[in-house]
Amino acid sequence: MLDLLRLQLTTFIMNDVPTPYACYFQDSATPNQEGILELHDNIMFYLLVILGLVSWMLYTIVMTYSKNPIAYKYIKHGQTIEVIWTIFPAVILLIIAFPSFILLYLCDEVISPAMTIKAIGYQWYWKYEYSDFINDSGETVEFESYVIPDELLEEGQLRLLDTDTSMVVPVDTHIRFVVTAADVIHDFAIPSLGIKVDATPGRLNQVSALIQREGVFYGACSELCGTGHANMPIKIEAVSLPKFLEWLNEQ
């Protein structure tokens, strides 16, 4: 019993899938997503402080004017308060904007990736190409990924999230995702990895990721792309480097 309790206390269950009525982010698995979470929490703190201050000022003004409206009848403007409510919000916006721009540029940087994976959006499935690897036939390792239909789902699989084949990647490796589309605009989005990039026909967009823990991460197309839009899930399995090489040899 004590061993079971100790296991429960020392085991962290990560939230890497959408959950009903969720009001917060999924657990981060990359430095980019960790930065997004930290920025969100910091901004929310400032917003709550501002909300409390504005609510207190509004309540105070309403109560003051209600008790003695005649005394303030001929006050038309106040230069001091006008200067304050102009400068103070500008300072707050600068405080918020500065770290936002830093994070934005950091997320866009792709520095010396160890491998490149190309994700191509189709109506309504994904195709993945491991451009750095060639199989025994001399061809690039590539495969297509389709959603598992409801009637073929097995116990434990997630509806509209599980796919017949998964993208397999190694952890602690700088990965560059090159994203495009073959027909209409799609969007390659995996919340836990902090990835959301448009897949545009005729254009190559790129984003990097450094996955720091093993696990299965789910995403989906986040751009309305037709009647089968809901049937474009993304499933990424992050494994250790030896397991990744073993999987690669099987392709």
UniProtKB/Swiss-Prot annotation:
- Look up and give the membrane topology term: Multi-pass membrane protein
| Keywords, ordered alphabetically | Copper, Electron transport, Membrane, Metal-binding, Mitochondrion, Mitochondrion inner membrane, Respiratory chain, Translocase, Transmembrane, Transmembrane helix, Transport
- PTM summary: The N-terminal sequence of COX2 is processed by IMP1.
What's the record's note on cofactor binding? Binds a dinuclear copper A center per subunit.
State where Cu cation A2 binds. Answer: 221, 223, 225, 229
Q: What is the lineage of its organism?
A: Eukaryota, Fungi, Dikarya, Ascomycota, Saccharomycotina
Provide GO CC annotations from the record: mitochondrial inner membrane; mitochondrion; respiratory chain complex IV
Show which residues sit on the Mitochondrial intermembrane side of the membrane: 16-30, 109-251
Where is it predominantly found?
Answer: mitochondrion
* Cross-referenced InterPro entries: CcO_II, CcO_II-like_C, CcO_II_C, Copper_CuA, Cupredoxin, Cyt_c_oxidase_su2, Cyt_c_oxidase_su2_TM_dom, Cyt_c_oxidase_su2_TM_sf
* Protein's name in the database: Cytochrome c oxidase subunit 2
UniProt key word Transmembrane helix: yes
Which cofactors? Cu cation
Q: Where does Mg(2+) bind?
A: 223
Q: Which residues cross the membrane?
A: 31-64, 79-108
